[in-house]
From Swiss-Prot:
One annotated Gene Ontology cellular component of this protein: ribonucleoprotein complex
The encoding gene: rpsK
Superkingdom as given in the UniProt entry: Bacteria
Protein name per the record: Small ribosomal subunit protein uS11
Quaternary structure, from the entry: Part of the 30S ribosomal subunit. Interacts with proteins S7 and S18. Binds to IF-3.
Keyword rRNA-binding annotated: yes
Gene Ontology MF term list: rRNA binding; structural constituent of ribosome
Length: 133
């Protein structure tokens, strides 16, 4: 049997720089993680970061400090594409909501508006039972 040959090694394509002044920052803060996504007004993703991607594992992903670092990293990547002003959409009940918004402004992005888009069930699925520790 002949030795296996590997295919051509693919180089990672460098993303082309978009020049977008106004964007949207979507902060999804759950009980376990915080994900910050910065998009253009149409909804195409420019940059994103999460608490796990920044380097936190396990229960430390749900801390406000992890959300702060994730928001700073997403803002830094978005500023490379020319984003200067964002409208913030916050979703979820997690602990990193406010700190993520604060760190977006601290990173140099101007926050235009803040909207809470947390979905609420109109008597839909049964919620998880209470924890007994």
């Amino acid at each position: 049997m002949p030795p296996k040959t590997r295919g051509a090694v693919r180089k990672p394509r460098k993303k082309d720089k978009k020049n977008i002044a106004l964007g949207q920052a979507h902060i999804k803060s759950t009980f376990n993680n915080t994900i910050v996504t910065i998009t253009d007004p149409a909804g195409a993703v420019i940059a994103w970061a999460s608490s796990g991607e920044v380097g936190f594992k396990g229960s430390r992903k749900s801390t406000p400090f992890a959300a702060q670092l994730a928001a700073e990293q997403a803002a830094k990547r978005a500023q490379e594409h020319g984003v200067r002003k964002v409208d913030v959409f916050v979703k979820g009940p997690g602990s990193g909501r406010e700190t993520a918004i604060r760190s977006l402004t601290a990173a140099g992005l101007e926050v235009g508006s803040i909207q809470d888009v947390t979905p609420s069930a109109h008597n839909g699925c049964r919620p998880p039972k209470r924890r007994r520790v």
